[in-house]
Regions:
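Bacterial N-terminal signal peptides that target proteins for export
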Residues: 2-12
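Bacterial N-terminal signal peptides
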Residues: 11-22
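Residue-level hotspots at or immediately adjacent to binding/recognition sites across diverse folds
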Residues: 22-337
Length: 337
């Protein structure tokens, strides 16, 4: 009897090894054939928050913690520190910057709003009401004297006169936020501070619409795809996309690299088909088919930072912001002749 069972056990063990190896092969992603991201040396080690450019694609501004303010005039290849005399005893953390032409805005915490009309040659402080719900969290320049600002508890305001007056867009705030994203047509999605639920808002609605998260995993970040769908990143490296125009219907969740234990922090589209996914410990993934399959950019995995934010100013100009003053700049790979 033992003589019969011994070969059978060997076959079972061999089959298990084959399955394990197959699982490992699927668990670790293939490397990309090229690396378009270059590390930019910056004169700071502060955590970076946001980047924006004027109507001149070579002239931009970078903001971050402890009043970090950097300017570039060569398309982001080099950056120079700029200081502002704000006259306060404490230090601000700048969290958002946006330009429309030569007119720009910077928000920060504790509550501060800065405005420029000369591409940043001079910055003026815009007074904010003490009754403002929360502190400025993000701002988007919409045009001449026009901008839309959100606070860290989801109050949305718009100005049409350069910040002299502000109109409330929602009647009630949503609560303390972890992350918030805005679509090009003015829709918002916000993740609660603990990642337990998310809320959406569209122009014309009086209040935010709450939604339960799609699984037991807490939400990390959410945003809009280029075709109008929502995407979400959940704890444990999980990614999920919604159905078009239905924020309650979702495709199956998946882990692009389920052998990894780190989480994702941001996702951004360079083109409708090319999607970049950033996470902790220098992890950077890319999909060239709209999120169906993924590859890993292993050339940057030794960068000693978490990648917090991916931003494409245009398909040809992109940046990844991280901790410790880490900035990656996208350089499009020359096409073969």
């Amino acid at each position: 009897m033992n003589a019969i069972l011994k070969p059978l056990r060997q076959i079972v063990i061999l089959f298990a090894v084959v399955l394990l190896c197959s699982s490992c092969a699927r668990g670790f992603l293939a490397n990309t054939s090229f690396n378009p991201w270059q590390v930019v040396n910056l004169p700071t080690r502060e955590t970076l928050s946001d980047v924006a450019f004027t109507d001149d694609s070579k002239h931009g501004w970078l903001v971050g913690k402890n009043e970090t303010l950097l300017e570039t005039i060569d398309g982001g290849k080099t950056w120079e520190p700029r200081s502002l005399e704000l006259g306060d005893a404490f230090t601000y953390s700048f969290n958002s910057v946006s330009f429309s032409g030569s007119e720009g805005w910077i928000t920060g915490q504790p509550s501060i709003l800065l405005h420029t009309t000369d591409a940043g040659k001079s910055w003026l402080r815009v007074p904010l009401s003490e009754k403002l719900p929360g502190s400025p969290y993000s701002i988007l320049a919409l045009g001449a004297k026009s901008a839309e600002m959100m606070t860290d508890i989801g109050a949305i305001y718009r100005t049409q006169d350069g910040g002299k007056t502000w109109q409330a867009m929602v009647q009630e705030a949503v609560g303390v936020l972890r992350n918030v994203s805005r679509s090009p047509d003015g829709k918002y999605v916000a993740v609660s501070s603990r990642g337990s639920f998310y809320s959406t808002w569209e122009p014309g609605q009086d209040a935010w619409q709450p939604h339960n998260r799609t699984s037991s995993r807490r939400l990390q970040n959410m945003g809009f795809s280029q075709d109008g769908r929502l995407w979400l990143l959940a704890r444990g490296g999980v990614v999920q996309f919604s159905q078009p125009d239905d924020y309650e219907a979702w495709d199956d969740a998946f882990a692009p690299e389920f052998a990894a234990s780190w989480g994702f922090l941001d996702l951004a589209y360079r083109t409708p088909e090319e999607v970049w996914l950033a996470g902790g410990s220098g992890n950077l993934l890319v999909s060239f088919d709209g999120g169906q399959t993924w590859q890993k950019d292993k050339a940057v995995e030794d960068v000693p930072a978490n990648f917090y934010k991916i931003l494409f100013v245009s398909p040809e100009q992109g940046y990844i912001l991280g901790q410790n003053g880490i900035l990656l700049r996208y350089e499009e790979t020359p096409k073969a002749a």
